[in-house]
């Protein structure tokens, strides 16, 4: 009686063994899309096209092992891995233990992290035809970079993105 179901049992058993390997995101093949969805990959609408299975598995594994932080080094590494150039600066407020020559940053800057990055498009200066409430320099913001870094932002902090002209 079991001879009829033998092939089906072997198939179910082999699928069960492959699903055991799927528990680890770095080894997943069948459930790789589900793991990517769970970890929010690809981040900020970036495309998966062109990535091999091994690269996708590695990316999911890195995301699983990642420990978030708002340290300068961590944020710069995340931006560099995504292909962006960022310089992170913290302006801490003055207190009595600092040197007298330390700049007097306002207290609100204690909760801000400043991100200096090159502007995406060429910067153009405002003209008399622009609205009064517009900034004096007009440029395109790098929304992909902002989305990527704001995913790691703690609730009590504010990321301030400052776009600079690239010096040649």
From Swiss-Prot:
InterPro entries: Phage_Mu_Gp48. It comes from the Bacteria. To phage Mu protein gp48 an E.coli YmfQ. This is Mu-like prophage FluMu protein gp48. It comes from Haemophilus influenzae (strain ATCC 51907 / DSM 11121 / KW20 / Rd). The lineage of its organism: Bacteria, Pseudomonadati, Pseudomonadota, Gammaproteobacteria, Pasteurellales.
């Amino acid at each position: 009686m079991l001879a009829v179901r033998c092939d089906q049992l072997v198939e179910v058993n082999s699928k069960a063994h492959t699903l055991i390997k799927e528990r680890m995101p770095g080894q997943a093949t069948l459930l790789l899309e589900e793991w990517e969805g769970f970890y929010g990959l690809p981040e900020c609408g970036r495309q998966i096209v062109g990535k091999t299975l091994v690269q996708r598995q590695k990316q999911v594994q890195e995301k699983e092992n990642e420990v978030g932080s708002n340290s300068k080094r961590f944020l710069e590494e995340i931006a560099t891995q995504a292909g962006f150039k960022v310089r992170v600066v913290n302006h801490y407020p003055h207190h009595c233990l600092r040197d007298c020559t330390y700049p007097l940053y306002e207290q609100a800057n204690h909760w801000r992290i400043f991100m200096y990055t090159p502007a995406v498009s060429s910067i153009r200066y405002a003209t008399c035809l622009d609205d009064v409430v517009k900034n004096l320099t007009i440029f395109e913001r790098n929304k992909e970079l902002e989305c990527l870094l704001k995913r790691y932002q703690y609730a009590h902090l504010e990321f301030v993105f400052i776009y600079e002209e690239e010096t040649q």
